[in-house]
Amino acid sequence: MTVGVLALQGSFNEHIAALRRLGVQGVEIRKADQLLTVSSLIIPGGESTTMAKLAEYHNLFPALREFVKMGKPVWGTCAGLIFLADRAVGQKEGGQELVGGLDCTVHRNFFGSQIQSFEADILVPQLTSQEGGPETYRGVFIRAPAVLDVGPDVEVLADYPVPSNKVLYSSSTVQIQEEDALPETKVIVAVKQGNLLATAFHPELTADTRWHSYFIKMTKEIEQGASSSSSKTIVSVGETSAGPEPAKPDLPIFQ
């Protein structure tokens, strides 16, 4: 298995190092044709506007969208979450191009500026169930985004409480409002939808590799599913062309 890491800007080296600790090869991706050589892709944290401009300059967006549509596993961290979202608010004037595919609305820099970056322990029940370890994960939030709402097919993996004076989002008016703020509410910071995984924080900046392990297993499951589907299709075609021979049970053709 080879995992690609988009290497335009940001913490791509840290992701590759985390993969290496798990015995998985990570390769830097800077050109569209390099996506053909990898099983899955990580879009790292960084400065999302800069990353988008570089991706546009290298004409990467069409290839990235096709990679997602093909069902290839993609994990976005921080800026990568913004890339994968279908909708984004709080962007700079003119906005930025998105890859899309994740049915959610994300708020860029929801938690504030660089000096408001922080670390916090977040509950991660599904991660703990699959990977073991502590019930919490140390999230590193650097100018971090947050997911404001999700579609019905999106699974929420982690959320984080925000204080009562934090500005909230109203999806009905597509505006930022605080008039209906609750004493305490939660925003979503990790999600999964099909072949897409996204975290608002930076797992690559910690020694805890459980999120990377989770993504590797997710990649293997998707690859095995695709291989199984392909095998059944090949067997089915063979039976159709065999004419009057009796139908045979589906058998694995790759050992």
UniProtKB/Swiss-Prot annotation:
Transmembrane segments: none annotated. Its EC number is 4.3.3.6, 3.5.1.2. One of its GO terms (biological process) is pyridoxal phosphate biosynthetic process. Its main location: cytoplasm. Keywords: Cytoplasm, Glutamine amidotransferase, Hydrolase, Lyase, Pyridoxal phosphate. It catalyses: aldehydo-D-ribose 5-phosphate + D-glyceraldehyde 3-phosphate + L-glutamine = pyridoxal 5'-phosphate + L-glutamate + phosphate + 3 H2O + H(+); L-glutamine + H2O = L-glutamate + NH4(+). Pathway: Cofactor biosynthesis; pyridoxal 5'-phosphate biosynthesis. GO terms for cellular component: cytosol. Residues 225-255 are annotated as: Disordered. InterPro entries: Class_I_gatase-like, PdxT/SNO, PdxT/SNO_CS. L-glutamine binds at residues 46-48, 108, 142-143. Strongly expressed in roots, stems, leaves and flowers. This is Probable pyridoxal 5'-phosphate synthase subunit PDX2. It comes from Arabidopsis thaliana (Mouse-ear cress).
